[in-house]
Amino acid sequence: YELQIDFDRLRKAIGDEYVVLFSPHYFIANSIDLSKYEGFVINVARYDEINELYLVSDIIMTDYSSVFFDFANLKRPIVFYMYDYDLYQSRLRDFYISLDELPGPITRTQEELEKCIINIETEFPKYERKYEDFNKKYNYLDDGNASERVIKEIFKEAV
């Protein structure tokens, strides 16, 4: 499998300010050698709890994974890297939601991705309204009271 991201180039572009926690799809996780990127890219494919990785992440960069739904609860930047969107849509499947609803920039080239990460502090505010709308629509139950609602629902007949 050939990665569609050049980590050497990314490192040059964004410098040592970031460490990439790379979670490849399980189909390819064992076929990727990231040893030459030690200190910059860490393969976290075998890490059991992705929610813990969200907590230590400043930005999430994803393609078509649904991870952004959970990450959006943190109200941190989400960058979509859809280098093969046309192929993905025509041969595999459509996306979960309309691209217009995505709470972050869509990048299609490595150059766009790099620029977006470098300028994240000015890019992220441009998506504030979409972010709010996205969370209202898809994460509205994540208000700190979800467990209480579940307990009440389970035990409502017992009370």
What are these regions (language model features)?
Residues 1-34, 107-109, 148:
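Conserved catalytic-core segment of nucleotide-activated headgroup transferases in glycan assembly
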Residues 3, 106, 139-143:
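Aromatic-acidic/polar surface patches that form glycan- and anion
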Residues 17-18, 57, 75:
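Short, well-ordered alpha-helix to beta-strand connector turns
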Residues 21, 26-69:
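Donor nucleotide-activated moiety binding/catalytic core segment of transferases
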Residues 32-39, 66-138:
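Catalytic binding pocket for nucleotide-activated donors in carbohydrate/polymer assembly enzymes
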Residues 43-44, 49-51, 101-104, 140-141:
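Short, contiguous acidic/charged loop-to-helix segments that flank catalytic cores in large enzymes
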Residues 142-159:
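C-terminal alpha-helical cap of glycosyltransferases
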